[in-house]
Amino acid sequence: MEAPYSMTAHYDEFQEVKYESRCGTGGARGTSLPPGFPRSSGRSASGARSGLPRWNRREVCLLSGLVFAAGLCAILAAMLALKYLGPGAAGTGGACPEGCPERKAFARAARFLSANLDASIDPCQDFYSFACGGWLRRHAIPDDKLTYGTIAAIGEQNEERLRRLLARPTGGPGGAAQRKVRAFFRSCLDMREIERLGPRPMLEVIEDCGGWDLGGAADRPGAARWDLNRLLYKAQGVYSAAALFSLTVSLDDRNSSRYVIRIDQDGLTLPERTLYLAQDEGSEKVLAAYKVFMERLLRLLGADAVEQKAQEILQLEQRLANISVSEYDDLRRDVSSVYNKVTLGQLQKITPHLQWKWLLDQIFQEDFSEEEEVVLLATDYMQQVSQLIRSTPRRILHNYLVWRVVVVLSEHLSPPFREALHELAKEMEGNDKPQELARVCLGQANRHFGMALGALFVHEHFSAASKAKVQQLVEDIKYILGQRLEELDWMDAQTKAAARAKLQYMMVMVGYPDFLLKPEAVDKEYEFEVHEKTYLKNILNSIRFSIQLSVKKIRQEVDKSTWLLPPQALNAYYLPNKNQMVFPAGILQPTLYDPDFPQSLNYGGIGTIIGHELTHGYDDWGGQYDRSGNLLHWWTEASYSRFLHKAECIVRLYDNFTVYNQRVNGKHTLGENIADMGGLKLAYYAYQKWVREHGPEHPLHRLKYTHNQLFFIAFAQNWCIKRRSQSIYLQVLTDKHAPEHYRVLGSVSQFEEFGRAFHCPKDSPMNPVHKCSVW
């Protein structure tokens, strides 16, 4: 799944653009008098008089009036032709509809594109700076954000729409889920009540977990009854806090028609294991800030021996980091190499210090047999976790597990807790100002009531007509991939047949799931209590209900049409174990997509993102799954070897890019780079197909660029973005995407059609002689 490409971008007030007639004639030219009226013979004025018939005065006046009326009609006809014919109606086959919205959209598009450009930069030298230079000059990063870009601007508009929807009264028409999400939003905004409660709600949770230090001291009677498995049940099965490992219900990678319990490495608070190892100055700063954060939260919660507790918990997390494997390691990307299906009996032998049957029986409310199969994705890690449990004092294990619950819930507490979180985020990512409360609460509403909020969003901000148009655009791009597969000279016939089958079976979801149109169906997703005065309790109710829904899946039939994200999400994704692409309504907004924009911009905008997700089905990760979403090697050895050889060229290309003295990791970002490059090509060729079928588009007013050039400009302007320097460190370390500058340069420089469109000299930076290409 893609990380969020985190709703219309900051358009100015655009003036209307006046177009000439599509027919290329002036409004008065070719206008003839009505039948029966004689034409002028071209004689001089003096000679004309002698040729007039001798009409009486009344007839002369009548004729003059008719001539005046005819002239007025001609002028009106010219004005109407100027207004309703022209570039704005391109592709409509005639006059555009009343009001001509596409003409205004063309004007907006022209203003947006030209404002973002920096025409002083040679596009053949640095296309990103050419396409985004104007935008980068005009925009600063808001104080409460880590990054800001053209897609983030779309997010701002979507957020404003969602806030207005949530601000409406709780009563009135609509289902129970809609009333609950509004009540939840209000409970989050009620900072007076949250502040009045202070740490008390969290202290109740800690007490439920057994308190700190096994009830206060290691020699108390309660310590003798301490049970690691019971506390793991509380953490994982009640509060959804991953500790020591993660426990989820997922599709079985080798049999995607069934759900399976999946166990994997987890339990670290910081986002990447290398941050715990303090291998460079950046990670040392993060680790020091994390230690301060731990001590601050422990003091707020009234813990004793704060420094000692923090140090012991940190050391335990460092031990977990040392036995973990980075998510970007080759081992983790090869799913077949980590997939290990075992019975509960076998799992018990791998990790003898955990009581797996008891733990799973409690969480799932089942009576599992020893033969129940689970998927273990980190066998070596779990063996070492068992040894870590054996060698770690119970008090430290207990405090670590309680800490993991505290970390998960602390963002929902009173201002002192939120300030501590902000100070850590500031050191890690550089955001100077905490998010305003309304944005925080909107984020929580999205997280806990995503589909309920989505039902409100699509009802008012995404039409069925837009859904149909985007679906057609997706089909056009899929068609091009089918053609490209036939043309590949490095893939043999057997592998091509399997690749075509995968394309044919691929599911495409656009806009929103249909069940959102039925309030009673949405209500079933949120059958838990919500009260406006109990924010943290609302969170806990949501967590417990989500766990209930998840554990029920283990015996349910798989429905591959379900969505991972709600429709207002500013994201798009491909799921290999479903062979499913999803394009939510939240990302199908201007400037990425506008039904009235020139198609060059739609294909360069949302089209390249569609192509990106489509290509994920055939990259180094998605290519491990077959047409049904099963982990199955469908390549011949010869074709796969040639694929890896071509992929290595891309690895070397991105390894040569640096940002803030950090080298981009070409292997780490390989899948996304393949998808960027492939998506650009697929969308471009799909646009050429559209032009062949509908005819060329009229130029954008006052822009000297061809529509082929505008396609590439639109692609680049998807990724106009500014980042804080601290966040760049984490991006290069943890993000599977290359920095945006190089997402653009790496893609266009390897595509021969870009060099042709901009007439770039051979071996110029954007048109190297030797290019990397997979799809």
Curated annotation (Swiss-Prot):
Protein's recorded name: Endothelin-converting enzyme-like 1
Job of this protein: May contribute to the degradation of peptide hormones and be involved in the inactivation of neuronal peptides. Cleaves the synthetic substrate Z-Gly-Gly-Leu-pNA and releases pNA. May protect against C2-ceramide-induced apoptosis.
Disulfide cysteine pairs (residue numbers): C124-C760, C132-C720, C188-C441, C649-C772
Induction trigger: By mechanical damage to nerve cells.
Pfam hit, one: Peptidase_M13_N
EC number: 3.4.24.-
GO cellular component: plasma membrane
Taxonomy of the source species: Eukaryota, Metazoa, Chordata, Craniata, Vertebrata
Gene Ontology molecular-function annotations: metal ion binding; metalloendopeptidase activity
Domain Peptidase M13, residue spans: 99-775
